């Protein structure tokens, strides 16, 4: 694959790349690029994790990058996920969550057999070098910066937290260096951790990143967008200048199950949730359905077909998102027709995951999770 083609795949559907020129240089030099993305184990997998993240993993694989999934069981424990029960977190991590991410990659056309999974607790066990890295990173980072960085856990800056939460950011940064990851990947909400990694990289004596010329380097970082939840915002209308500050609050969240879609939702559930979604006619600045079309449907399918009766103008076929957005803004596409078409597209995309969790071990793992969440 040509250098520009590899870079185009890496940059596709991303918010930003930290160290973009460094990345281009690495590709041109034939440097081995090691990717990872880490996940807290916090319940069912929704489209933000299953499709948004894994579609980028598929792009990276197509670009010839070594891809790794980090199952962050200790981080989940620190952040009180699944009731803060470490045994349950580990059980779900190596069971349901791993199965769900493999199925998600299949949904976007990737090969799950090429994925490497790492469980945090196994990486840390009897690993003095890792803990030396945590300490060294902490020594090079101020307390105030660590406190500001707890937003990577979905916590508000300035809130009261137990001390363990302050260990989370340096652990996340240390995960990068101990695994020799030169291209960490995450949603844009994890940016603060990646910036710390770049800021401390040249100061490290334990677990430094070294390129194929023997030079100490900084990790690059690829950040993708967070997709919106389907609900109506608490404040409407939203002024354009306010929207950017509110996006992290409006992102898809499994704590609001009616405003998100899980990878194994039934066809009926997918249609029900999308039919209820906030989608104002001609509104393009804040529109979750359009956001999903832009971030999920087009990157995965490359097109969207709008099916509607002849009396309402007949079927339409779009090969680019800007054209669809333009027509929606003019009122040429009705929200109901857009919703129906998006539901149909997602049902087809999610079929491999839906089928995967209908039987066998995967079905048992999902049932275990459901029972665990009820009794928690």
Protein language model annotation of sequence segments:
Residues 220-261:
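Active-site and channel-lining beta-strand-loop segments
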Residues 244-319:
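Internal helical hairpin/lid segments
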Residues 1-228, 232-236, 286, 301-376:
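NTP-dependent nucleotidyl-transfer catalytic core
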């Amino acid at each position: 694959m040509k250098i520009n083609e590899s870079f185009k795949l890496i940059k596709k559907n991303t918010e930003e790349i930290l160290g973009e020129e460094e990345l281009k240089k690495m590709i041109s030099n034939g440097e081995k690029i090691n990717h990872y993305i880490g996940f807290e184990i916090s319940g069912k997998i929704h489209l933000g994790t299953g499709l948004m993240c894994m579609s980028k993993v598929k792009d990276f694989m197509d670009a010839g990058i070594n891809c790794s999934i980090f199952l962050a069981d200790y981080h989940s424990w620190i952040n009180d996920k699944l009731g803060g029960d470490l045994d349950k977190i580990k059980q779900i991590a190596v069971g349901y969550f791993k199965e769900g991410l493999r199925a998600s990659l299949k949904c976007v056309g990737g090969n799950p057999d090429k994925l490497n999974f790492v469980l945090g607790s196994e990486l840390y066990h009897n690993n003095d070098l890792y803990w030396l890295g945590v300490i060294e990173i902490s020594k090079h980072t101020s307390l105030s910066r660590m406190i500001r960085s707890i937003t990577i856990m979905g916590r508000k800056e300035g809130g009261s937290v137990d001390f363990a939460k302050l260990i989370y950011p340096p652990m996340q940064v240390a995960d990068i260096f101990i695994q020799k990851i030169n291209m960490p990947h995450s949603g844009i909400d994890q940016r603060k951790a990646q910036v710390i990694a770049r800021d401390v990289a040249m100061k490290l004596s334990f677990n430094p990143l070294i390129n194929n010329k023997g030079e100490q380097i900084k990790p690059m970082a690829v950040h993708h967008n967070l997709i919106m939840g389907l609900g109506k915002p608490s404040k409407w209308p939203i002024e354009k200048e306010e929207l950017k500050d509110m996006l992290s609050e409006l992102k898809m969240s499994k704590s609001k199950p009616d405003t998100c879609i899980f990878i194994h939702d039934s066809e009926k559930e997918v249609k029900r949730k999308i039919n209820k979604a906030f989608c104002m006619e001609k509104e393009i600045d804040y529109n979750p359905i359009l956001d999903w079309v832009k971030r999920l449907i087009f990157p995965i399918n490359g097109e969207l077909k709008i099916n509607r009766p002849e009396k309402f103008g007949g079927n339409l076929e779009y090969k680019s998102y800007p054209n669809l957005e333009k027509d929606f803004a003019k009122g040429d596409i009705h929200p109901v027709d857009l919703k129906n078409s998006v539901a149909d597209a997602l049902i087809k995309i999610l079929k491999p995951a839906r089928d995967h969790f209908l039987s066998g071990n995967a079905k048992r793992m999902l049932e275990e999770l459901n029972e665990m969440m009820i009794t928690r």
